[in-house]
Design a protein with these regions (language model features):
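Pocket-flanking alpha-helical
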Residues: 38-71, 94-96
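Short, polar/charged alpha-helical segment
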Residues: 9-41
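A short alpha->loop->secondary-structure connector
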Residues: 124-134
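Hydrophobic residues within well-ordered alpha-helices
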Residues: 45-47, 101, 123
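Ligand-binding "clamshell"
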Residues: 27-29, 63-77, 124
Length: 139
């Protein structure tokens, strides 16, 4: 029986390299691997449905799924795991603690970006800074 041909888009991570270099095989599948940046991969997946299997932004996936407009099915594999506490950068002449962000303008590339969801949760849960306390600006 011929192997199932599937396109697989993923980032170049230590956690995916064994698939890409062939060390780990997928039984019954002849994959065509594409190493792409997350931005390109997510855009092409959601806009053009370019891949059979791909890494996706969890929050963008949930937005699409909730709207009944997602062609993908999620599986519980998280390729990028990081604490997002160090992912916020502020002007050192104005912000001394997270609570100082209340009422400030904050630039974000996308509201639903998974890292931004984490950051808002950290600010709310750990520091009492609710999303409505911030002025989020699309950059």
């Amino acid at each position: 029986m011929p192997k199932l041909q599937l396109s697989v888009a993923m980032g170049d991570y230590d956690r995916t390299r064994a698939l890409f270099d062939g060390t780990v095989q997928i039984d019954g599948v002849e994959p065509t691997y594409m190493l792409l940046s997350p931005e390109e991969m997510f855009f092409r997946a959601f806009r053009f449905r370019d891949f059979d299997i791909c890494e996706l932004s969890l929050s963008s996936y949930l937005v699409k799924h909730a709207g009944g407009n997602c062609p993908y099915i999620a599986i519980p594999v998280f390729l990028s795991r990081a604490f997002r506490h160090t992912a916020m950068y502020v002007r050192k002449d104005r912000i001394r603690r997270p609570e100082d962000l209340k009422g400030k303008r904050i630039g974000v590339p996308e509201y639903q970006l998974t890292a931004n969801v984490w950051a808002r949760s950290i600010l709310a849960d750990d520091h009492g800074v609710q999303p409505q306390d911030l002025s989020l600006i699309h950059i």
